[in-house]
């Protein structure tokens, strides 16, 4: 009986260690510019792998990689962040943000750096179809004393970089081709 309990304990501990996940909460920090003639109507996560957004390391000396995710999921976390922190033109054009890539990681060597990469398609919606207006991507890599605690800053930075790029583009002059999701494949 004792052996069975030990085996169950070790197996249970193994499951707990391997199922750990680092949740990242995007902090409220106002975006310094405002939308020029648009508002974010929706955020869609169209990444091929939606299981996580990368990894973070846990522990001081014996670092363990654990999956990282945005609290509430990518769509909800980014939409709520923009809703609270980005001054938008609610009388403007509704824009759908499609997240095609979002990845974070940490280097293992010294100095330890945190990395964030994002790719976003900015789209208009018409009769249930999306038409791409603009594509933006951003990458940032920065050292930090506690890299895992600063992932959210880097995620916000790459989101804002793409948003500013779209805001400064000539998106209003583009006539997109509209495709339903099933027609793309």
Question: Model-derived features: where do they sit?
Answer:
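C-terminal/domain-edge helix-coil "capping" segments
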Residues: 141-185
């Amino acid at each position: 009986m004792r052996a069975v309990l030990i085996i169950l304990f070790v197996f249970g501990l193994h499951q707990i260690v391997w199922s750990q996940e680092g949740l990242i909460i995007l902090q409220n920090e106002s975006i310094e510019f405002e939308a020029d003639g648009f508002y974010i109507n929706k955020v869609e996560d169209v990444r091929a792998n939606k299981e996580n957004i990368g990894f973070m390391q846990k522990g001081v000396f014996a670092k363990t990689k654990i999956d990282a995710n945005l609290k509430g999921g990518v769509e909800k976390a980014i939409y709520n962040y923009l809703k609270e922190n980005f001054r938008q033109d609610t009388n403007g054009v509704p824009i759908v943000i499609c997240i095609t890539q979002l990845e974070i990681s940490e280097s293992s060597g010294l100095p330890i750096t945190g990395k964030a990469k994002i790719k976003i398609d900015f789209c208009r919606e018409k009769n249930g179809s999306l038409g791409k207006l603009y594509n933006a991507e951003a990458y940032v890599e920065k050292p930090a004393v506690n890299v895992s605690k600063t992932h959210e800053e880097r995620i916000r930075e790459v989101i804002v970089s793409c948003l500013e790029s779209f805001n400064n583009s000539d998106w209003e002059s583009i006539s997109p081709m509209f495709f339903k999701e099933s027609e793309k494949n």
